[in-house]
Curated annotation (Swiss-Prot):
Membrane-crossing segments per the record: 30-50, 51-71, 102-122, 137-157, 162-182, 211-231, 256-276, 283-303, 350-370, 371-391, 413-433, 441-461
Principal location listed in the UniProt entry: membrane
Example GO BP: D-serine transmembrane transport
Species of the source: Escherichia coli (strain K12)
UniProt membrane topology term: Multi-pass membrane protein
InterPro entries named among the record's database cross-references: AA-permease/SLC12A_dom (IPR004841), Amino_acid_permease_CS (IPR004840)
Disulfide bonds: none
Record key words, sorted: Amino-acid transport, Cell inner membrane, Cell membrane, Membrane, Symport, Transmembrane, Transmembrane helix, Transport
Listed PANTHER family: D-SERINE_D-ALANINE_GLYCINE TRANSPORTER, GABA PERMEASE
Periplasmic topological intervals: 123-136, 183-210, 277-282, 434-440
Protein name stated in the entry: D-serine/D-alanine/glycine transporter
Observed phenotype of the null mutant: Mutant exhibits increased resistance to D-cycloserine when grown in a minimal medium, but no change in D-cycloserine sensitivity compared to its parental strain when grown in a complex medium.
Regulation: Beta-alanine uptake is inhibited by carbonyl cyanide m-chlorophenylhydrazone (CCCP), which dissipates the proton motive force.
GO molecular function: beta-alanine transmembrane transporter activity; D-alanine transmembrane transporter activity; D-serine transmembrane transporter activity; glycine transmembrane transporter activity; L-alanine transmembrane transporter activity; symporter activity
């Protein structure tokens, strides 16, 4: 299944046959960082802080720890065969064509749903400056812009993600530095609140809402990490993947400590967790509370670009998944055609049209944070399915191809054990989703996607995949 599309570095290669390795190490490192700093951190952390209090720091650390091992499994598998274009390829190769079909289409749907959440977030951030702006205007403008830029070249996507990620990095580092200065100077907000690390343990302790509050923080916190596997969809367009992919994956723990743990510690030191408004981004509200409205506008711009960055990643990855699925015969043939610039243009256009569903979602559920919660729950469940498929593929790889593991230059630590630990953790998170009313609704809707996929495989996909193999 993995040798049907040639992947080349030569910019002069025939566009109809090949993707091009035009993403450099600089692009891959920043794409990985940008993927780890998702909309969920900016948009969802207000709700998670209000649900869990300071214990949300441990929630992010636990999820990050688990996903690091998922990414290590993905990295070893992708590097075991450089013909793999993405994780749907090794799922198809190791688990069977059905797995490639389910993984590819589910990952496509994951990013469409995530893109809808980004559209919702962009609308909310735009209303910070333009409260009377129609929802659909901001959404449509962003979608058209992303489509136009992605139709250019894969290098354009890499450049956009590079600068989007740089904006996020500078903003979060600045927030941490400013917050530390406020704490050191015992800064007082207009409401009389003094910045202090003591807010982390003085207002009810580390677990003010008990274990129930701690567990409740996992759902939106999981969504903050979606996109962490994005480097796995760039494998076919990366120069020197043997060096770039390990470097990007190995930096995950540092990124989590810097961008999640430190940022949340500073936010809750300047603004007591009990004062955080669930419906608003604490990154914006932090500066509003300390009387710096101009800085709040800057941060609002940053979180808006973060949402645009996430949507940009979604547009890229969905088009590449559709391209691979079409090559395997389980998606319309039109998606397998590349433009003169080696870009899957029809897949890009189709995915962007689907993003307009975010606008529809706002009409169905006028509450922005309510719509965001419902969308993110569906997305989190589907991403956990994809991560589980990666782990299952790794277990089969270890059993059926031990010789490849032995000579691997990038072995997953504690491979088999951590696969089972991570899968048990995902089951635990799904159980937690049944405890809250808003997340339970989305959990009940999600199986409809798998039923639709199953019917598609039974009546169409299975036959087409068999014909292509012959």
């Amino acid at each position: 299944m993995v040798d049907q599309v040639k992947v080349v570095a030569d910019d002069q290669a025939p566009a109809e046959q090949s993707l091009r390795r035009n993403l450099t190490n600089r692009h891959i490192q920043l794409i990985a960082i940008g993927g780890a700093i998702g909309t969920g951190l900016f948009m969802g952390s207000g709700k998670t802080i209000s649900l869990a209090g300071p214990s949300i720091i441990f929630v992010y650390m636990i999820i990050g720890f688990m996903l690091f091992f998922v990414m290590r499994a993905m990295g070893e598998l992708l590097l075991s065969n450089l013909e793999y274009k993405s994780f749907s390829d090794f799922a198809s190769d190791l688990l069977g064509p059905w797995a490639g079909y389910f993984t590819g289409w589910t990952y496509w749907f994951c990013w469409v749903v995530t893109g809808m959440a980004d559209v919702v977030a962009i609308t909310a951030y735009a209303q910070f400056w333009f409260p009377d702006l129609s929802d659909w205007v901001a959404s449509l403008a962003v979608i058209v812009l992303l489509l136009t830029l992605n139709l250019a070249t894969v290098k354009m996507f890499g450049e956009m993600e590079f600068w989007f990620a740089m904006i996020k990095i500078v903003a979060i580092v600045s927030l941490i530095v400013v917050g530390l200065v406020m704490v050191a100077m015992h800064f007082q907000s207009p409401t009389g609140v003094e910045a202090s690390f003591a807010h982390l343990w003085n207002d009810g302790g580390w677990f003010p809402k008990g274990l129930s509050g701690f567990f409740a923080g996992f759902q939106i916190a999981v969504f903050a990490f979606v996109g962490i596997e994005l480097v796995g969809t760039t494998a076919a367009e990366t120069k020197d993947p043997e060096k770039s992919l390990p470097r990007a994956i190995n930096s995950i723990p540092i990124r989590i400590i810097m961008f999640y743990v430190f940022a949340l510690i500073v936010i809750m030191s300047v603004t007591p967790w009990s004062s955080v408004v669930p419906e608003k981004s604490p990154f914006v509200e932090l500066f509003v509370l300390v009387g710096l409205p101009a800085a709040a506008s800057v941060i609002n711009f940053v979180v808006l670009t973060s949402a645009a960055s996430s949507a940009n990643s979604g547009v890229f990855s969905t088009s590449r998944m559709l391209f691979g699925l079409a090559q395997e015969g389980v998606a319309p043939k039109a998606f397998a055609k590349l433009s003169k610039r080696a870009v899957p243009a029809k897949g890009l256009t189709f995915s962007c049209i689907c993003l307009l569903g975010g606008v529809v979602m706002l009409y169905v559920n006028p509450s922005v944070i309510g719509a965001f919660t419902m969308i993110t729950t569906v997305s989190a469940i589907l991403f956990m399915f994809v991560w589980t498929i990666i782990l299952c593929s790794y277990l089969v790889y270890r059993k059926q191809r031990p010789h490849l593991h032995e000579k691997s230059i990038y072995k997953m630590p504690l491979g088999k054990l951590m696969c089972w630990v991570c899968m048990a953790f995902f089951v635990f998170v799904v159980v937690l989703l049944t405890l809250e009313d808003d997340t339970r609704q989305a959990l009940l809707v999600t199986p409809l996607w798998f039923i639709a996929l199953g019917l598609g495989w039974l009546f169409i996909g299975k036959k087409r995949a068999a014909e292509l193999r012959k």
